[in-house]
A protein has these predicted regions:
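A broadly conserved amphipathic alpha-helix scaffold signal in soluble, globular proteins
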Residues: 62, 79-82, 95-98, 196
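Acidic, glycine/proline-rich low-complexity segments that act as flexible tails and inter-domain linkers
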Residues: 1-38, 49-51, 55-58, 65-66, ...
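Short, structured motif recognition centered on aromatic/hydrophobic residues
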Residues: 40-47, 77-78, 156-164, 195
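Alpha-helical oligomerization segments
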Residues: 187-215
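A short structural micro-motif
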Residues: 48-49, 80-87, 165-166, 197-204
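Hydrophobic alpha-helical bundle cores within soluble ligand-binding/oligomerization subdomains
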Residues: 64, 75-76, 193
C-alpha cells in the first residue's frame, strides 16, 4: 500500500478527519482491478469535476508522480478531459500544475484529427439525427484526442467514466465510455473498482452509477 501524500498536513488540519480521509485513500489505492496510473487518474479527474484545485490537487499530483506517472501523462489526461469537464476549468488547472512545479509540456506539435471508428463513430452518427451541428462539433473534439499518444484508450475511457459518475451523466455517455473501456480490456471487476474508488468523491453518486452500470 503506498504512503498517502499529504497525510501529515491533514493531521494538522484535523486529526479525526485525517483518520477518515486516510481510510478512503487506502480504499482507492488498495483496489485490485485498477492500475496505479488509473487510480491516480481517478483522483486527478475528480479534482477537475468538483473542482478542488488547491490542496487536494497538490496531494494527488504528488501521489501520481510518486507512482511513476509521467508529468506529460498528467498533461495529456487534462488535455483529454477538456470537452468533458469544460475548457475554462482546464485553464486554471494548467496554471495550478505550473505552480506545483510540473515540468513544461514536451508536446507542442499541431493537433491532428484521427477518423472515428467503432463506438465513437456510432455515437456521433446517432447524435447527427438530433443535431447535425452538435454532431460535427463533437466529432472534431473526439477525433482530436482519442487516438493521441500518452494515454491508452482504457485510461481515457476510465477518466471519462469518472466524469460521468461525478456529473451523473448516467445515460448514453456512461454507456459509451463503459463500452470503450470494455473494448480496451476492462472487465466488470474493473468497473466495480472504479465506482468504488470514485465513492470517495461522493458516495451517493457512486450508488447511482453502480445501478446504471448493472453492477
Amino acid at each position: 500500500m503506498p504512503q498517502l501524500a499529504g497525510a501529515e498536513a491533514l493531521v494538522r488540519l484535523d486529526p479525526v478527519f485525517a483518520q477518515l480521509a486516510a481510510g478512503v485513500g487506502h480504499n482507492l489505492w488498495g483496489l485490485a482491478h485498477l492500475t496505479m496510473r488509473e487510480k491516480a487518474f481517478v483522483c486527478l479527474t475528480a479534482d477537475l469535476c468538483h473542482p478542488h484545485l488547491d490542496v487536494p490537487l497538490a496531494m494527488h499530483v504528488q501521489m501520481a508522480l510518486s507512482n511513476q506517472v509521467e508529468p506529460e501523462a498528467i498533461r495529456e489526461l487534462y488535455r483529454h478531459l477538456a470537452p468533458y469537464v469544460g475548457y475554462p476549468i482546464l485553464v486554471t488547472a494548467f496554471q495550478r500544475l505550473a505552480e506545483l512545479g510540473l515540468p513544461e509540456a514536451r508536446d507542442d506539435k499541431p493537433v491532428e484529427l484521427t477518423p472515428l471508428r467503432g463506438e465513437l463513430a456510432r455515437a456521433v452518427h446517432d447524435l447527427a439525427a438530433v443535431d447535425q451541428g452538435l454532431a460535427e462539433f463533437s466529432e472534431e473534439q473526439l477525433a482530436q484526442r482519442w487516438a493521441r499518444p500518452g494515454l491508452s484508450v482504457r485510461e481515457r475511457a476510465i477518466a471519462c467514466l469518472v466524469v460521468d459518475v461525478c456529473y451523473q451523466t448516467l445515460g448514453e455517455s456512461l454507456r459509451l465510455h463503459a463500452a470503450l473501456a470494455r473494448s480496451a480490456g476492462a472487465t466488470d471487476d474493473t468497473l466495480r473498482d472504479l465506482v468504488r474508488g470514485v465513492a470517495e468523491f461522493g458516495m451517493a453518486r457512486s450508488w447511482a452509477a453502480a445501478r446504471a452500470l448493472g453492477l
